[in-house]
Amino acid sequence: MMSSDDLFLRAFENSAGHMANLDAVKSIVERLAGQGHSLDDIIQLLEREMEGAEVTLQTDLRILINETQHLVRRKTST
């Protein structure tokens, strides 16, 4: 069974090719991963990161959130 961090990192790997601000998102992912957060907490923290961020970073974080949610749905449907 995948841990929350494993699933979050997989979501980042899956979506990284679609991001304009890869270094900024990678920094956020590295900061959040390994902290023992639940996926719901990670998504809330990412949404907080979006507040006040420039538009392309907001879009990149939304891509990451969507991919994380997609993997969660896939995991729970199998």
Predicted region positions:
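Charged low-complexity stretches with an acidic bias
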Residues: 51-78
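Non-catalytic all-alpha helical scaffold/repeat segments
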Residues: 2-4, 9-16, 45, 49, ...
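Short, well-ordered alpha-helical segments
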Residues: 37-44
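N-terminal acidic leader/helix
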Residues: 2-36
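Alpha-solenoid repeat scaffolds
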Residues: 18, 39, 53-56
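Alpha-helical repeat scaffolds in large eukaryotic proteins
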Residues: 30-33, 47, 69
